[in-house]
Regions:
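Sec-dependent N-terminal signal peptides
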Residues: 6-16
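C-terminal segment of classical bacterial N-terminal signal peptides
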Residues: 16-25
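Core of compact, soluble alpha-helical bundle domains
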Residues: 26-147
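N-terminal secretory signal peptides that target proteins for export/translocation
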Residues: 1-4
Length: 147
């Protein structure tokens, strides 16, 4: 009787380990775009993000003349493409877009805070947040003109 309990225990442990590794492997194979929830979820986050920026007195002046509908579309396409989705960003490059705006490091950091707040609103996981920020972060050098 004792021998069979040990076998059952070992079998359960092996099955649990196999199942866990399969789930982990499956999650790792999914693109960031898929893990974010696709274009609909990205659209929701971007809309919230733009709202956050509009309410943020530290940086909303940079956007006073922006076409918010066009900005929304470009940001959705940019995040979708950057995260491995099927969208294509067709807007201007970041250096051209921000030339002469005198964006400061503090303003850029405030923008990132507003993005993180939008991601948090939709309970985006830490891994996905970190990956998205890592993909978008290199744009800083083309956006910030005043360190």
């Amino acid at each position: 009787m004792r021998f069979s309990k040990q076998i059952v225990t070992i079998a359960i442990a092996v099955a649990a380990t196999w199942t866990l590794s399969s789930v982990t492997s499956f999650a790792a194979e999914r693109s960031l775009y898929e893990r974010l929830g696709g274009v609909g979820a990205i659209q929701a986050v971007v809309t919230k993000f733009i709202g956050n920026v509009g309410a943020d007195k530290r940086i909303n002046g940079y956007f006073k003349n922006a076409d918010l509908k066009q900005l929304n579309k470009h940001l959705v396409d940019q995040v979708c493409q950057a995260s491995g989705g099927p969208c294509t960003y067709a807007g201007r490059d970041m250096k051209t877009t921000h030339k002469g705006m005198k964006v400061t490091t503090a303003a850029f950091n405030a923008l990132v805070e507003d993005l993180v707040s939008a991601l948090d609103t939709f309970n985006v996981g830490k891994q996905e947040k970190d990956e998205l920020l890592a993909v978008l972060g290199p744009m800083k050098k083309d956006i910030v003109e005043v360190p």
